[in-house]
Amino acid sequence: MRIRVPATIANFGPGFDVFGVGIGEPYDELKFVESDEWEIEVEGYDVPTDGRNVAVVAARALATLVGEELYLRMKLRKEIRPRSGLGSSGASSLAGALAAARVLGIEDDGLIIKAALAGEEAASGSAHGDNVVPAYYGDFTIIESLNPLRVHRIPVDFPLVVVLPQIEVPTREARRILPERVPMGDAVRNVALAGALVKALTSGDVQTVGRLLEDRIALPYRLRLMPWFARVWKAALDAGAYGAFVSGSGPAIFALGEDLHAIGKAIAEAFLEIGVDAEVYITRAGVGAFWL
């Protein structure tokens, strides 16, 4: 059995820890069979090949939640780079949870997502759901609550460009530097942006979605980890982007616009000017996990 789980853009614009969407590339792929012990083999990026692997953590978590004994032999094709801002740990965690669910015959969304979040917490120190949830559902997702699980979904299908520089931004550090309180004016601005962005998504107005890619809650404090952001953001807009923003906690950047190849090239060249190579993905939003 084999499951493919996509990369995700979390913290989409003003929706810190709430908005997220799956994208077509890159992705993680997990093959698995029942076994008499836990085993995991990894191809691609370097991640643990023992019980610390988040796919194993999540699969075990689901078995524990339902009181079942389970052992799997897994082979993980790891194409989403860790610490990329593209939901790497969330994708592997969800893959593990879905594998366990398939073997155990579990179809409960809440249980599967709860198990996947156990893997996410093991990796990042926080059980935030804005990678796991959109990867699971495949739509643009709005997390009202994780416990109980309440998710609002907006079907989307629009092209975008993602640029991934050869820089790492550790998720734990990116969360640690956030303040416990923000100014009232910033909170009000984010509410306004979030409401308008949801309206634009429901009407398919991608140009307005791009214009609303702004945040006052998290990004201002994370810029110390991404001093290059203003440079690449300007390069994207100068190349015709409707808007550009950080994916997750970075360093990946995504942008919306008409000529995505030109926009991606401009962002990559802006990184190259500071001595950093970058990969460019022309892909689509609105992709979820699926069985192969």
Curated annotation (Swiss-Prot):
Single Gene Ontology BP annotation: threonine biosynthetic process
Main localization, broad class: cytoplasm
Top-level taxon: Archaea
Keywords of the record: Amino-acid biosynthesis, ATP-binding, Cytoplasm, Kinase, Nucleotide-binding, Threonine biosynthesis, Transferase
One cellular component (GO) term of this entry: cytoplasm
GO MF, any single term: ATP binding
Residues annotated as binding ATP: 81-91
Keyword Thylakoid among record annotations: no
Ranges in coiled-coil conformation: none
Pathway stated in the Swiss-Prot or TrEMBL entry: Amino-acid biosynthesis; L-threonine biosynthesis; L-threonine from L-aspartate: step 4/5
Database matches in Pfam families: GHMP_kinases_C (PF08544), GHMP_kinases_N (PF00288)
EC number: 2.7.1.39
Catalytic activity: L-homoserine + ATP = O-phospho-L-homoserine + ADP + H(+)
InterPro entries cross-referenced by the UniProt entry: GHMP_kinase_C_dom, GHMP_kinase_C_sf, GHMP_kinase_N_dom, Homoserine_kinase, Ribosomal_Su5_D2-typ_SF, Ribsml_uS5_D2-typ_fold_subgr
Compartment list: Cytoplasm
Gene3D superfamilies: 3.30.230.10, GHMP kinase, C-terminal domain
Protein function: Catalyzes the ATP-dependent phosphorylation of L-homoserine to L-homoserine phosphate.
UniProt record similarity statement: Belongs to the GHMP kinase family. Homoserine kinase subfamily.
NCBIfam families associated with the record: PRK01212.1-4 (NF002288), thrB (TIGR00191)
The protein, known as: Homoserine kinase
Organism: Thermococcus kodakarensis (strain ATCC BAA-918 / JCM 12380 / KOD1)
